Structure formats: structure tokens, C-alpha cells
Amino acid sequence: GQFQVRNIYLSVDPAQRGWANEGTNYAEPVALGGVMRALAVGVVVESRCPQVPEGIHLYGWFGWQQYAAVDQSALLWKVDLDIAHEGAWLGVLGLNGLTAWIGLKHLARAKPGETVIVTTAAGAVGGAVGQIAKACDLRAIGLTGDDGKAAVARAELGYAETINYRSATDLSAAVAASA
């Protein structure tokens, strides 16, 4: 069965720029005039699938469009509005947050009291890493490309220190001094 989702929030991600180019990429390019691939949070407004009732909120690859026709075989996640607002499912509770968590806890295996250094500290994944690091009693040093982003990373994203890699005369020395 199929169902129709009305998108409420759409993701805008750096990868989408690459998908707009013709040629070799890790994913098929989006055709000119086609619907841009994107994760979205939406509400089911019509359903011909008993497992997916109308009114339920979902997170999935619905694309940049107001409405998406979705097959029941699509990879979807139910959005629990008791946990967080719909928009959070595109950020810290979605793919960016999952990427941050896996990178920090499962790949880096960072332990409380350790220091981690994060590139693109003010980006979607880097911002989530900073917050998770702080919650896990890690000291996070963030690399950013300008002083405004550095200030946001310190004030809002959990970073103990930040380094503007564009203005640092010796990045290695700046990192060593911060660590």
C-alpha cells in the first residue's frame, strides 16, 4: 500500500549541492526539474496502508516537495512528538545526530575526561558532536572557519574552546595549545 505525506520540515544539506551536478558521484544526480532528495518530517494525510494510519508523523526521504507519495516498503521512522518537536528529528535526533553519536562514541570511543577535536564545529554534525561531548563529560575543541561561528560553537554548542583555522598562523600549534 501507499500513503501520502504532507511535509512539515525539509532538510537542506551540503550533499544536495553535489547531487545537483551531472556526472560521477556517490549517488545518482537529481535531474534538472526533478525533486531534490531530502530527509523530511511530515504527517500522513491519506493512507491505503493499514500499518500507517493517517495523522502519524514520520521521518524519511520525502524530498523537497509539499506532498510525497510513499510506498510502505520505504525506510521510515516514526516521529515521537512526546520526545521532541518535529524539527529536532532533522537535527540531533535524525541523521546528523546519529552520525555524531556513532563517530564520537563508537568510532572514536571517547571516554569521560578526554579531549576531542572536531572539524566543522558549527555545522550540523559538528554542532551535535559538541553537545553530545559536553553531555558525556568530554572536553571539545572545535575548528571553525570564522570568528562568528566560533562564538556560536562556544556559547551554544558545548565547545570548551574553538580555533578559527583560517586565522590561525600555525594550526598545529594552536591545537596543541588548546589541548
Model segments located where?
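Adenosine-nucleotide cofactor-binding segment
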Residues: 134-179
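Glycine-rich beta-strand-centered segment in the early N-terminal region that forms part
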Residues: 1-12, 20-64
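N-terminal Rossmann-fold NAD(P) dinucleotide-binding loop
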Residues: 126-127
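Alpha-helical segments flanking ligand/cofactor-binding loops in enzyme cores
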Residues: 5, 53, 130-131, 151
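Gly/Ala-rich phosphate-binding loop of Rossmann-like dinucleotide-binding domains
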Residues: 100, 130, 134
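NAD(P)H dinucleotide-binding glycine-rich loop of Rossmann-like/cofactor-binding domains
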Residues: 36-43, 51-120
